[in-house]
Curated annotation (Swiss-Prot):
Its EC number is 6.2.1.1. Mg(2+) binds at residues 549, 551, 554. Keywords: Acetylation, ATP-binding, Ligase, Magnesium, Metal-binding, Nucleotide-binding. This is Acetyl-coenzyme A synthetase. It comes from Thermosynechococcus vestitus (strain NIES-2133 / IAM M-273 / BP-1). Its cofactor is Mg(2+).
């Protein structure tokens, strides 16, 4: 009996090796070393993770059992006692890192600040004491709705220090979206700012908090702490609202880290599904600490001299894991930038790299596509010679965008780590280890040691080499989410019941289509929800989009299916052109034929729609379900709280 899978139709055969001088200094410096680590972890996962936990982290009390697995519920480092901020801060004060830069911050208007590990520790302890004075106790949830300023990281670390789980809400979310998340988390206190800078404009954060809390909208919230960032006037509600700087003044910097059970709740982070209520992803303390620590160290090949910059916002999991917790646990210097490329300074990212001598640069494919559109002249006008490693995160990267990144930003000398992971996984799952594995443009490479990734059909049968299927993980890992906050049934249904268990083995269902090639490299083909069924052939959107973007006139493309009586679905492509290209019927035909030449007639788009923008979430992901509705001429329904620019939908409707 055959079971539906996803057809793979795009071939990419280019191969790139890390430079010899990079390999010579790398922590994991050969394919043989990677294979040995991977096989060691596969043979005895508990021993592998237990050994790393002992070597890499400091514990208040040792664990009794590495893993207690009662599918789908995992407990890691059972009955161990630990505090993530002790590992991120206190232990470094006993070494030369005490006076090392922990956090470099660059504000959009050009102001800046650097905090050493000693200074960051002091500010975290002071703010932890402020929280205690306001009645926040171990187990109380704290909402954080902040711009990208040091106080955002300080607030997260202060919460973790006293055992108060934080729930960071991205500062671009509306008051309604903020209210929903604060209600679900039953937050006792909210930390915010008067405003933040983004693209030369002030984002009025405190006003949004006031709207969210209006008319007892979130009855659990007792206090609001406000950082002065932009200095614009805001309403301060007596008895509820307090200025951060007033309460921080003169507060003791003595606040011992609370011993936390390994499985104590560390944070809740909300991720939107295509429709319905956002899911509160739960991460706990010890497993998350270890997993973000070791993935940061190995994937970015961290060295003591690195200046590491992840361009994400702390409101997303990438900011949690790879701006705050992972780098600081390793004693690294992590850079935080408040703004984004904007008309007044489109080359601001390259200015930051040049100014601080950034050595590791980690950004999203959507940003890389924007850089391509802005032109090579911007990065070429800056000195980017400090860079030694590049990374991508958030979605699969088209091979041509990968090549541009490698050539223009990395100067063909910086390895690229293309990292596949999710809010739910806590950290990197499939990724290159830069000194060990050759790179294939567009491939996430191989599973991280300890991650048993596979590609299967809907019955759990492994599919063949280069056959598309469903990406699954066959064994628990320390960084995995523990549940959906307050909804364990949703956790089980969403992640563990799509594919039935086989021989007692459960499958974590990632929701992505993928294939594995003859070298064991994984190629992520996009969300399963985005698969298009054309005449019985199930095609992933990613490969068709990659073919379109490989045309010199195309800056970005998004592909969706549109219902068709004969074929089931037909392919509709929304295309943003490069600056010099102009829309025309001739170009439409040329692009359709280009896809045929690259992939085959099966993938020929029925329609090419030119546009100047695509509907994206505030983290830069294309909202294809909205495009599906537009392509089909239907009304857009469902949750649009994550949509960054609502005017894009109106422009797309007018152009259809």
């Amino acid at each position: 009996m055959s079971h539906p899978t996803i057809e793979s139709i795009l071939q990419e055969n280019r191969l790139f090796y890390p430079p010899d001088d990079f390999v010579a200094k790398a922590r994991i410096h050969s394919l043989e070393a990677y294979n040995a680590l991977y096989e060691k972890a596969k043979a005895d996962p508990a021993a592998f993770w237990g050994e790393l936990a002992q070597q890499e982290l400091e514990w208040f009390q040792p664990w009794e059992q590495v893993l207690d697995w009662q599918p789908p519920n995992a407990k890691w480092f059972v009955n161990g006692k630990i505090n993530i901020t002790y590992n991120c801060l206190d232990r470094h004060l006993k070494t030369w890192r005490k006076n090392k830069a922990a956090l470099i911050w660059e504000g959009e208007p050009g102001d800046s600040r650097t905090l050493t590990y000693a200074q960051l520790h002091r500010e975290v302890c002071q703010f932890a004491n402020v929280l205690k004075q306001l009645g926040v106790k171990k187990g109380d949830r704290v909402g954080i709705y902040m711009p990208m300023i040091p106080e955002a990281a300080i607030a997260m670390l202060a919460c973790a220090r006293i055992g108060a789980p934080h729930s960071v809400v991205f500062g671009g979310f509306s008051a309604e979206a903020l209210r929903d998340r604060l209600i679900d988390a039953q937050a006792k206190l909210v930390v915010t700012a008067d405003g933040g800078w983004r693209k030369d404009a002030i984002v009025p954060l405190k006003d949004q908090v006031d709207k969210a809390l209006a008319h007892q909208g979130v009855p659990s919230v007792e206090n609001v702490l406000v950082v002065q960032r932009t200095q614009q006037p805001v309403t301060m509600v007596p008895g509820r609202d307090h200025w951060w700087h007033d309460l921080q003044k003169g507060v003791s910097a003595d606040c011992p880290a609370e011993p936390m059970d390994s499985e104590d709740l560390l944070f809740i982070l909300y991720t939107s599904g295509s429709t319905g209520k956002p899911k509160g992803v739960v991460h706990t303390t010890a497993g998350y600490n270890l997993y973000t620590h070791i993935t940061t160290q190995w994937v970015f090949d961290l060295q003591d001299t690195d200046v590491y910059w992840c361009t994400a916002d702390v409101g997303w999991i990438t900011g949690h894991s790879y701006i705050v917790y992972g780098p600081l646990s390793n004693g690294a210097t992590t850079l935080m930038y408040e703004g984004a490329p904007r008309p007044s300074n489109p080359g601001c990212f390259w200015d930051v790299i040049e100014k601080y001598g950034v050595t590791i640069f980690y950004t999203a494919p959507t940003a890389i596509r924007a850089f391509i559109k802005m032109g090579e002249h911007l990065p070429r006008a800056r000195d980017l010679s400090s860079l030694r490693l590049l990374g991508t995160v958030g979605e699969p990267i088209n091979p041509e965008a990968w090549m541009w990144y490698y050539r223009v930003i990395g100067g063909e000398r910086c390895p690229i780590v293309d990292t596949w992971w999710q809010t739910e996984t806590g950290g990197h799952m499939i990724t290159s280890l830069p000194g060990a594995l050759p790179m294939k443009p567009g491939s996430a490479s191989k599973p991280f040691p300890g991650i048993l990734a596979d590609v299967v059909d809907l019955e759990g049968n492994p599919v063949g080499v280069n056959e598309g299927g469903y990406l699954v993980i066959r064994h628990p890992w320390p960084g995995m989410m523990r549940t959906v906050y307050g909804d364990p049934d949703r956790f089980r249904r969403t992640y563990w019941e799509h594919i039935p268990p086989r021989d007692g083995q459960y499958f974590y269902f990632a929701g992505d289509g993928a294939r594995r090639d003859e070298d064991g490299y994984f190629w992520v083909m996009g969300r399963v929800d985005d698969v298009i069924n054309v005449s019985g052939h199930r095609l992933g959107t990613m490969e068709i989009e990659s073919a379109l973007v490989s045309h010199p006139a195309v800056a970005e493309a998004a592909v969706v299916g549109k219902p068709d009586e004969v074929k089931g679905e037909e392919i509709v492509a929304f295309v943003i052109l490069e600056g010099s290209a102009t829309p025309s019927d001739a170009l439409q035909q040329e692009l359709k034929q280009h896809v045929v030449n690259e992939i085959g007639a099966l993938a020929r788009p029925a329609e090419i729609r030119f546009t100047d923008a695509l509907p994206k979430t505030r983290s830069g992901k294309i909202m294809r379900r909205l495009l599906r509705s537009l392509a089909a001429g239907q009304e857009v329904v469902g949750d649009t709280s994550t949509l960054e620019d609502r005017s894009v939908l109106d422009r797309l409707r007018q152009g259809s």
